[in-house]
Amino acid sequence: MALSKEEILQAIEEMKVIELHELVEAIKEKFNVTAAMPVAAVAAAPAGGAAAPAEEEKNEFDIILTGFDAAQKIALIKEVRAVSGLGLKEAKDAVEKGGETIKSGVSKEEAAAIKKQLEAAGGKVEVK
């Protein structure tokens, strides 16, 4: 006589906590499995919502164009295109709009080099 899934779930639903614990232990033993969460899932959710350690150095940065010198607008648009790979219209919009992320996920050294290039072309740049 085979039980249906619904009957099994109904029986489990009616069990007490100690009975559920015994059932889980019996299943572990019978089928040689564990009920432990995978390590990746445990590491993905830090306990208590704790912040990342302060000493951990950030290794990916975003370059944000916060403003520009109007006299050097064309040179800056050209530089934004060269750095980001954007088209002419997108680069122009990014320069004029301000606050746009020009490039993201770059190394510290690359971020410093891009910042230097954009500032030389008249841009005001923030690295986050």
From Swiss-Prot:
One of the record's GO cellular component terms: cytosolic large ribosomal subunit
Paired cysteines (S-S): none
UniProt GO molecular function: mRNA binding; structural constituent of ribosome
InterPro entries: Ribosomal_bL12 (IPR000206), Ribosomal_bL12_C (IPR013823), Ribosomal_bL12_C/ClpS-like (IPR014719), Ribosomal_bL12_oligo (IPR008932), Ribosomal_bL12_oligo_N_sf (IPR036235)
GO terms, biological process: translation
Domain of life: Bacteria
Entry keywords, A to Z: Ribonucleoprotein, Ribosomal protein
Family: Belongs to the bacterial ribosomal protein bL12 family.
Function text: Forms part of the ribosomal stalk which helps the ribosome interact with GTP-bound translation factors. Is thus essential for accurate translation.
Quaternary structure note: Homodimer. Part of the ribosomal stalk of the 50S ribosomal subunit. Forms a multimeric L10(L12)X complex, where L10 forms an elongated spine to which 2 to 4 L12 dimers bind in a sequential fashion. Binds GTP-bound translation factors.
Protein name as catalogued: Large ribosomal subunit protein bL12
Native source organism of the sequence: Brachyspira hyodysenteriae (strain ATCC 49526 / WA1)
